[in-house]
Amino acid sequence: MIREERLLKVILAPHISEKSTVNAEKHNTVVFRVAIDATKAEIKAAVAKLFEVEVESVRTLVSKGKTKRTGGRVGRRSDWKKAYVTLAAGADIDFVGGAE
């Protein structure tokens, strides 16, 4: 069993992009930015508990940080992890819905 404090720290934010919107419409898949050390089991449990939906599968990838320059200095952005969460048929997560 994963502790509730950990589940709250796993999901950082929804990742909204053109690709994630198409995936949501066609494949019932939602994309999240997650903690770099999060496992698929933790992500699945966190989404199921926080959004009260049934999760079918989780796919993850680590996006490498870009090298950026500011003046003469060279720096690097942090690596971050993205999770594609496929929801069960009929399940839906509404991020932009207001009060009804």
Swiss-Prot record:
Gene Ontology BP terms: translation
Disulfide feature: none
A GO term from the CC aspect: ribosome
Domain of life, per lineage: Bacteria
MF terms (GO), sorted A to Z: rRNA binding; structural constituent of ribosome
One Pfam family, short name: Ribosomal_L23
Coiled-coil boundaries: none
Keywords: Ribonucleoprotein, Ribosomal protein, RNA-binding, rRNA-binding
Similarity section: Belongs to the universal ribosomal protein uL23 family.
Functional note: One of the early assembly proteins it binds 23S rRNA. One of the proteins that surrounds the polypeptide exit tunnel on the outside of the ribosome. Forms the main docking site for trigger factor binding to the ribosome.
Assembly: Part of the 50S ribosomal subunit. Contacts protein L29, and trigger factor when it is bound to the ribosome.
Record HAMAP family: Ribosomal_uL23_B
This protein's name: Large ribosomal subunit protein uL23
